[in-house]
């Protein structure tokens, strides 16, 4: 490995809180400790496709305000597969070589990529093809990246979902209503389960546990019989019935995305129990806003650790969090495993111990 003089950093995939804390940390440590230059690549790999590349020099005197900012000031994208990138003329083209050329044009010696499992898989494939020295940092509100106990963005998203449930609690009790809250998470129920327990949900539905609508309605009837005429239902967007049925929405270009399950569950509850029911879809509110103190801390820790991995020449690795410590794991390990809720884990046991219905009672 040659001497490191200039590194790049980019954010890829969906945004979340805590990304700017990572960028700030990388800049402070790379410049202050090692004397390297740091280049921020804008709009993920799409910034490297441009000629010249879309990038800015980052300095310690222009990044301190980033710590408490949500989103990513570098910009990001979760659209446009670089291996089959849609062109203006309607065709698709593999832009891998353009991305590699952009990396070389900037004179980078290493690259820090902040992303979820999909983004890290793409970056790794490009790095292997182009000989790019890559270090990964996991981020996703879904907390589904393998090999790490937690990813950047999850804590803030969970806090937001918990606060939403707190607010719905008061209006549900005031009107004797069933309030259904739909949250993100893709095929992992981490947000729904953690926020549901923290926010006092009576029913929590997650993708890992197929639900029966009759079980849900029985819980509501039980509460009614006990004189509790309101109910809080937390629903993860990708939940499925015992037959595997899910609710999805068709988006532009025919792509389907999770969404609409909250409305469906609310309608079923109203029809079967007669309870006045309302639904709230939290949506992208979970991604935005001021990062939680823990996401600021985790972002700062991950940024320093990623820079140290570069200094050690430990490429094709990702920073991970285990037992309240940072470790490094091969990126391949992280993208080949998918972290879902463990059915015999502490949170599921806690939910059942609290009498929370998980849809299969």
Curated annotation (Swiss-Prot):
Documented EC number(s): 2.7.1.11
Pathway this chain belongs to: Carbohydrate degradation; glycolysis; D-glyceraldehyde 3-phosphate and glycerone phosphate from D-glucose: step 3/4
Binding residues annotated for substrate, in chain numbering: 140-142, 177, 184-186, 237, 278, 284-287
Active-site residues (renumbered): 142 (proton acceptor)
Site (Important for substrate specificity): 118
Pfam families the UniProt entry points to: PFK
Presence of the UniProt keyword ATP-binding in the record: yes
Keyword annotations: ATP-binding, Cytoplasm, Glycolysis, Kinase, Magnesium, Metal-binding, Nucleotide-binding, Transferase
Cellular component terms per the entry's GO annotation: cytoplasm
Molecular-function GO terms, alphabetical: 6-phosphofructokinase activity; ATP binding; diphosphate-fructose-6-phosphate 1-phosphotransferase activity; metal ion binding
Chain residues that bind Mg(2+): 117
Family: Belongs to the phosphofructokinase type A (PFKA) family. Mixed-substrate PFK group III subfamily.
Protein's name in the database: ATP-dependent 6-phosphofructokinase 1
Organism annotation: Synechocystis sp. (strain ATCC 27184 / PCC 6803 / Kazusa)
